[in-house]
């Protein structure tokens, strides 16, 4: 994806590509615990530090969900941000100590239903596991190995994790086909837990909370 040059103010006004108006809103703070300079966004922002903010210390998602990235232009490690408060870096990242968060976009949820197919080999080969309207904290517990080399997201939006219990690097699967693990920006074909990303529009009881 080519880097775009829009400021947080432009994103907040919905001028950048992908603006979704009032249905998505996030407040980004420069310091931990919602202190310091702040920036409100209602659309994608490929470079959070281009204008007002020197860094990102905490986040409040008022409506979403959103997908944040470690680097500019929607690159690097991914972080799913559902409705709620994230007072410091370890509230959105559980894989390593990285307080770098430089780009952000709304995460489209195409409906209340969820279906996901996981495959052992690239190009949808080998063993297959189907998950329907459920969260799976351990693929091993369901008789599947940790090697996942291709994925079909039939319905809904999902997030996969490197380790059991929704730990490690996060990989988002929006509706579509992923023939090889490099298509979800992974370095190896390893997934050990997956869950649904839900929108309060259909799921009024709220969103996922990590233990």
UniProtKB/Swiss-Prot annotation:
Pfam families: Crystall. Residues 2-23 are annotated as: N-terminal arm. GO terms for molecular function: structural constituent of eye lens. SUPFAM superfamilies: gamma-Crystallin-like. The modification N-acetylalanine is found at residue 2. GO terms for biological process: lens development in camera-type eye; visual perception. Residues 109-113 are annotated as: Connecting peptide. Residues 200-211 are annotated as: C-terminal arm. Keywords: Acetylation, Eye lens protein, Repeat. Residues 24-63, 64-108, 114-155, 156-198 form the Beta/gamma crystallin 'Greek key' domain. InterPro entries: Beta/Gamma-Crystallin, Beta/gamma_crystallin, G_crystallin-like. The modification N-acetylmethionine is found at residue 1. Belongs to the beta/gamma-crystallin family. PANTHER family: BETA-CRYSTALLIN B3 (PTHR11818:SF13), BETA/GAMMA CRYSTALLIN (PTHR11818). Has a two-domain beta-structure, folded into four very similar Greek key motifs. Homo/heterodimer, or complexes of higher-order. The structure of beta-crystallin oligomers seems to be stabilized through interactions between the N-terminal arms. Crystallins are the dominant structural components of the vertebrate eye lens. This is Beta-crystallin B3. The lineage of its organism: Eukaryota, Metazoa, Chordata, Craniata, Vertebrata.
């Amino acid at each position: 994806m080519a880097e775009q040059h829009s400021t947080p103010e432009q994103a907040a006004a919905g001028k950048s590509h992908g603006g979704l108006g009032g249905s998505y809103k996030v407040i980004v703070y420069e310091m931990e615990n919602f202190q310091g300079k702040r920036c409100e966004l209602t659309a994608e922002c490929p470079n959070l530090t281009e204008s007002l903010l020197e860094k990102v210390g905490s986040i409040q998602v008022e409506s979403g969900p959103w997908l944040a990235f470690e680097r500019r232009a929607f690159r690097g490690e991914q972080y799913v941000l559902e409705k709620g408060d994230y007072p410091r870096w370890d509230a959105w990242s559980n894989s390593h100590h990285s307080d770098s968060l430089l780009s952000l976009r709304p995460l489209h949820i195409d409906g209340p239903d969820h279906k996901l197919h996981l495959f052992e080999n690239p190009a949808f080969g080998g063993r297959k596991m189907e998950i329907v309207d459920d969260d799976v904290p351990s693929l091993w517990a369901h008789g599947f190995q940790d090697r996942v080399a291709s994925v079909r997201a039939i319905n809904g939006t999902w997030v996969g994790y490197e380790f059991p219990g929704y730990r490690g690097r996060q990989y988002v699967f929006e509706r579509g086909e992923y023939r090889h693990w490099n298509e979800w920006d992974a370095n190896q074909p390893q997934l050990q837990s997956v869950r649904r990303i839900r929108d309060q529009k259909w799921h009024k009881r709220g969103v996922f909370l990590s233990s």
